[in-house]
């Protein structure tokens, strides 16, 4: 898709993660800083987002239910960045989330594509600490990708400004 250093660039960003991770809530918080009632996404949501530096983003929020994950690969061709959302409170499903991320990153369309992992729901008292999530994900093994890991809360908005900055940084890398 090209470098984001050029003026007027349009970047395609795909957001994936297991069901109930908070992808749709994050999408609409980033879009208008508003909290919306959500239902499980069947298919996808897509929203434009203007970013500093004359960058227009198109954010694709793809449903994360088990039966929809087989379609994830259909959204990877030509993307500029992957955002992968984890539910920090769902320790039982963390291995499943890691396995799905690995599968996505192994797709040939993902060669060299940077990714941002958002550890969502950090406001919850039972949320796993970011360092523990980092250790379990072992992201350093993905040497063919630029990546960042950020803690956030879609509910409170905590960490979403930093997530947006990371997103733009990765697009420029």
UniProtKB/Swiss-Prot annotation:
The GO annotation for biological process reads: hematopoietic progenitor cell differentiation; intracellular protein transport; vesicle-mediated transport
Stretch forming the signal peptide: none
Keyword hit for Lipoprotein: yes
The record's GO molecular-function terms, alphabetically, read: GTP binding; GTPase activity
Q: Return the Gene3D superfamilies for the record.
A: P-loop containing nucleotide triphosphate hydrolases
Pfam families the record matches: Arf
Q: What are the protein's UniProt keywords?
A: GTP-binding, Lipoprotein, Myristate, Nucleotide-binding
Record's GO cellular component, any one?
Answer: plasma membrane
- Whether Nucleotide-binding counts among this entry's keywords is yes
Which positions in this protein are listed as binding GTP?
Answer: 17-24, 61-65, 120-123
- Where is a lipid covalently linked (N-myristoyl glycine)? 2
Q: Which family does it belong to?
A: Belongs to the small GTPase superfamily. Arf family.
Q: What does this protein do?
A: May play a role in apoptosis. May act as a tumor suppressor.
Put simply, this protein is called ADP-ribosylation factor-like protein 11
Source species of the chain: Rattus norvegicus
Please spell out the taxonomic lineage of the organism that makes this protein: Eukaryota, Metazoa, Chordata, Craniata, Vertebrata
């Amino acid at each position: 898709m090209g470098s984001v250093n050029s003026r007027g660039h349009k970047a395609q960003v795909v957001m994936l993660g297991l069901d109930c991770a908070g992808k749709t809530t994050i999408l609409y918080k980033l879009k208008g800083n508003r909290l919306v009632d959500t239902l499980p996404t069947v298919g996808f949501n897509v929203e434009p987002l203007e970013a500093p530096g004359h960058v227009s983003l198109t954010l694709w929020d793809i449903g994360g239910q088990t039966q929809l994950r087989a379609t994830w690969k259909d959204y990877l061709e030509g993307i500029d960045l992957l955002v992968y959302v984890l539910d920090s409170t769902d320790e039982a499903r963390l291995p499943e989330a890691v396995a799905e991320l690995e599968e996505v990153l192994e797709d040939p369309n993902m060669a060299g594509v940077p990714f941002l992992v958002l550890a969502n729901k950090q406001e919850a008292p039972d949320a796993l600490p970011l360092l523990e999530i980092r250790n379990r994900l072992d992201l350093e093994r993905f040497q063919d990708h630029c990546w960042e890991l950020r803690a956030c809360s879609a509910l409170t908005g905590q960490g979403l400004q930093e997530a947006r900055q990371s997103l733009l940084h990765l697009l420029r890398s």
